[in-house]
Amino acid sequence: MAQGAMRFCSEGDCAISPPRCPRRWLPEGPVPQSPPASMYGSTGSLLRRVAGPGPRGRELGRVTAPCTPLRGPPSPRVAPSPWAPSSPTGQPPPGAQSSVVIFRFVEKASVRPLNGLPAPGGLSRSWDLGGVSPPRPTPALGPGSNRKLRLEASTSDPLPARGGSALPGSRNLVHGPPAPPQVGADGLYSSLPNGLGGPPERLATLFGGPADTGFLNQGDTWSSPREVSSHAQRIARAKWEFFYGSLDPPSSGAKPPEQAPPSPPGVGSRQGSGVAVGRAAKYSETDLDTVPLRCYRETDIDEVLAEREEADSAIESQPSSEGPPGTAYPPAPRPGPLPGPHPSLGSGNEDEDDDEAGGEEDVDDEVFEASEGARPGSRMPLKSPVPFLPGTSPSADGPDSFSCVFEAILESHRAKGTSYTSLASLEALASPGPTQSPFFTFELPPQPPAPRPDPPAPAPLAPLEPDSGTSSAADGPWTQRGEEEEAEARAKLAPGREPPSPCHSEDSLGLGAAPLGSEPPLSQLVSDSDSELDSTERLALGSTDTLSNGQKADLEAAQRLAKRLYRLDGFRKADVARHLGKNNDFSKLVAGEYLKFFVFTGMTLDQALRVFLKELALMGETQERERVLAHFSQRYFQCNPEALSSEDGAHTLTCALMLLNTDLHGHNIGKRMTCGDFIGNLEGLNDGGDFPRELLKALYSSIKNEKLQWAIDEEELRRSLSELADPNPKVIKRISGGSGSGSSPFLDLTPEPGAAVYKHGALVRKVHADPDCRKTPRGKRGWKSFHGILKGMILYLQKEEYKPGKALSETELKNAISIHHALATRASDYSKRPHVFYLRTADWRVFLFQAPSLEQMQSWITRINVVAAMFSAPPFPAAVSSQKKFSRPLLPSAATRLSQEEQVRTHEAKLKAMASELREHRAAQLGKKGRGKEAEEQRQKEAYLEFEKSRYSTYAALLRVKLKAGSEELDAVEAALAQAGSTEDGLPPSHSSPSLQPKPSSQPRAQRHSSEPRPGAGSGRRKP
């Protein structure tokens, strides 16, 4: 973007220099006094003066733009200021120069010319900061003088901050009576980022009274001559024409411009040139690029120039009006060049002589128009540093035409990635209260004024540091055409919707909550392709949006889905009830279409219910199942309208049959429901009457004789069984370990994929004791023949012979026994059957197994114990409790990760620990006579310690033999044990369980000869 330096002449003209051109001083122009070091780095403002009504009742406002001073080497032509203080702070520091304004989106501003002196009705920067310089009143201005622009300095102005003095550029003084000020009392107090400003009460003191006769001759102004580029001038001119209209000369009917009379030459005037009073221009060197622009955005000037004509047509058509709405005033004409020599801003030293000849050209290059006179006492709080544009004004109803056009232009650039700020957010400035603070901030509006889709709102601006200044209620003209265009824009909006105004109202400034717009509902955001997607396809893809939302009923889609559910096309039986049990219109349609595939004509209610339940798995929550049964009852009543009196009666009777089935065939403990109870529970439920008694008796008998069975998902059952039997399953499932097993996870069986088969053969099993050595009921103790398979740490019992790779049935899996921490011993005390051995598991269940031969019995015992010794993981320590009741610790079912050598050492350590604990327990029981429950618990603990000692002893002995054999084959272990010739170490005889041990007799039984008669037999006959 082209940038150039803009310098303002004393007549209000401007000249544009090329970007970053070297600066040099005019030979005639004095060099301004440099500001103190404390002023550098501060932020200044380009402001527009706020004043009261002008000659025609027009009011003006004031706006600031943040800027930062640039510094350069001092010019050798520094002249001491006649009013400079003697303090060191008043001396010009090195590196200061005149101020140049870099133009970038600066509005039509009233640039106040100050040469270190307070303007009429205002204060200089140094006085705002607490300076002590005496005020200098200025002479009266001509009638047309207040049309020129002024540049008022900010904290960045090259003025002394403490004890500030006037610039040395004004060396000619004019003596005469003071003229009344033309601006408001508080219209020009300085704009400070920290919110400081001179109070209006000090103005009278600062300006002095009528007796003051010292005035400044502002004829000799200083400037910073930079090379003027015609391209930069065209850009500046185009910017002004884009924002504020054409620069064509006023019409022939306009009043000719008035010129102020020249002031008499004052003291110290150079070459006797007289300059108009108040015409000394003070420049502020500012570069907006060096300041964090809080409320400004950039755009491409080339793109803006392309759309200039459209904006010009919208702006120039508005009559300039700052009075009441509906009153228009023609634009004030621009004055011609004032008499008297003045330094040219467009040339260097060589162009000084052509100053007066180029006056008319300077007028043509004028960018800013003059400002009107101001009314004193119009102090208003500053809303924001957002510039006020001519042609715009706050409105309580909406934006004006310029705002609409400008927002339309910015909207087109928003799509190109450029962010803008609305310039019409001025509504809250209309009528501030007299008691309000002079400073406040607001956030810029994120929404455009047109009824098009709202763009994403930018992040709210941080609270800005308040710049001192004022603004009037009617800063820009408000025309009737703007109201008409706004009315047309509102008429195009939908009924009942307010247009999103780009201006901030009081509510948007924190005084109230006002929604700026509403987003469309989420349902409208669904694309047409999604809405047209077939419901069946949604369900096939696993989508439940149609079912969950449920208010869009599609009969054709429901028919297609019902057909697929009935034929199980892409669905399982478990999915049918889920689709029929939803509480929405679409699911009701699907259920109605699904039940049409069933014909219940001529069937009793229980028969129809059995047929229906065979086709689907009645699953889900209670309310979902009740909805499915309601659909069934409706269909049954349609097929058999004569069987029952109403549809509600059919539904009531259907639910009663389901409850009766649960009561008669469930696992509940208690009294079963009788036929009389069933009939009595249904009294008065048939639409206020009773059901036929014979019907209820028939239904009760049918349910009692044959329970209702609904379909089970056979696919799920087959998959679970196949995964359990698969040698390489993807998912390992845990199955319950045997009949009567506890719910502990340590007792569950985990099929081991790829486990080795150590032995298989025929076995006959008898359950001798349930977990915790509880006696097995008599009806479950019988002997049953199986084919045993020792695979890993699980002993599988099958009905048929072992076949590698054969899948196991559910019954065979339930009969499986885990041998972790188990011990197999010869049942020497059992004499009813030969070749019987005991198998005691980790949960203290006891099984009796009968082998075909003695060798097979010995082989089963050896291999079961060796496998348990190799893979049983070390147990956890026993639980610690304050209770005296003994409880066995749980033993882990997972395989150990220790090597066989480490496993042997672990078993030997546990053997020593169990032996030591058993000795301590027996020593503690000496001399005590336990009674009742306490004695029984002590006996259980002693039996447990004895069993654990025997088990670890067997494990350690067998692993030592296996390691000595040096082979992983169990046949080698059996051969080594056979060569030892003793089974006492590896297979000691034991009883089935401690609770089943025969109690030893307190007195030894005396042996008697067979010929001796029994005691107490008397003379009875003896058997021969």
From Swiss-Prot:
Region Disordered, annotated ranges: 25-98, 113-230, 246-401, 430-536, 976-1024
Transmembrane stretches, start-end: none
Stretches with biased composition (Low complexity): 987-1004
GO aspect biological process, one term: signal transduction
Cysteine pairings via disulfide bonds: none
Acidic residues biased stretches: 300-313, 349-369
Location of the SEC7 domain: 512-706
GO terms under cellular component: cleavage furrow; dendritic spine; postsynaptic density, intracellular component; ruffle membrane
Phosphoserine found at: S126, S156, S720
Predominant location category: membrane
GO molecular function: guanyl-nucleotide exchange factor activity; phospholipid binding
Chain segments annotated as coiled-coil in the UniProt record: 898-924
Biased composition (Pro residues): 71-95, 327-342, 445-463
Tissue distribution: Isoform 2 is expressed in the brain.
Assigned keywords, A-Z: Cell membrane, Cell projection, Coiled coil, Guanine-nucleotide releasing factor, Membrane, Phosphoprotein
Family classification: Belongs to the PSD family.
Its job: Guanine nucleotide exchange factor for ARF6. Induces cytoskeletal remodeling.
Quaternary structure (record): Interacts with ACTN1. Interacts (ARF6-bound form) with KCNK1; does not interact with KCNK1 in the absence of ARF6.
Protein name listed in UniProt: PH and SEC7 domain-containing protein 1
Species the sequence originates in: Homo sapiens (Human)
Record gene name: PSD
